[in-house]
Amino acid sequence: MLPLKTILVVLEAGRDNQATWLQSLAWAEATGATLQVLVPVAPDVKPGLDLAPGLQDMASHNAEVAAGHWLEELEAEAPSGTAFAAIATGHPADTIVHEARRFEADLLMMGAGYLDDLRPLLRHLPCPLLLVRHLRTPGIFAGALGAGAEDAPHRVLNQVILEHLQLLAPCFGGKIRVLSALPNPAELVPLMGDAYAASYVATDLEKTYREGIEKQVTDFGMASDLVRVLPGRPDVVLPELVRQEEVDCLLLGTVARSGFAAFWLGNTAEDILPRVDCDVLVLRPQDYVEPA
């Protein structure tokens, strides 16, 4: 992904896309990337009506022309080099993946509510995904590091998050935070014994866990005082930390090859996404960039 050269921006014709559009302009200016704007549109056909191939092509053409007129206003304020395309399709996720590959996109931007199910998109998307919720340019970036990163995909995922956090924030003159949820000792050590033992294990676990997170952060040349840790489940703790730290953009990871089917600590990104009121950059292990 880094450095960014091409950002694919998905807009919905006739809808309020102001947040996504303005954010794409800000990201292009901050990173120097070129924008490719895609507007997937449904063919102009009544539901349940089966058209002959020629009429179907005409319906698709009419939908693309109508969307093209809608795009004219955006074209007037777009930076130099921006390209626009309206494509008639009944399968927007497939079209988005195809265009991301065609343009070799380094980042996909779209509104947080554009697709109800992100799994088909993330299964094949060749780049990270930024889900936009707000108009404001990000000023505070936070990376969500997962606990129990013993296996290779989880370790790489934490590296991906820290790498992007470290490189993106300076582009915007932004601040950095690293957020994490302290695992529940009762879940990790089910046979620990009495309450005293549980308390001892909890204290020891918190110290060990915090030190582990801080080491990952300092290994990337960042200060350990950027780390914020709270005890509890990630789907509860992370949204609370996002609110406390007034995070604008949360870097969130998924390790599942099939998208959101799995997430660190057994939690799903699907549980966290609806609970955070900020933009979210979704990263996967394959988004890691080897150091030059």
Q: Which sequence ranges carry the predicted segments?
A:
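Structural beta-alpha unit
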Residues: 1-3, 26, 54, 58-61, ...
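General small-molecule cofactor/ligand-binding pocket signal
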Residues: 36-38, 84-88, 130, 177-179, ...
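Small/aliphatic-rich secondary-structure junction motif
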Residues: 1-54, 141-199, 219-222, 275, ...
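Short beta-strand elements of ligand-binding domains
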Residues: 109-112, 129-134, 280-284
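Glycine-rich, Arg-bearing micro-motifs that act as flexible, cationic patches
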Residues: 107-124, 138, 249-275, 289
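A short acidic, glycine-rich active-site loop
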Residues: 55-69, 197-208
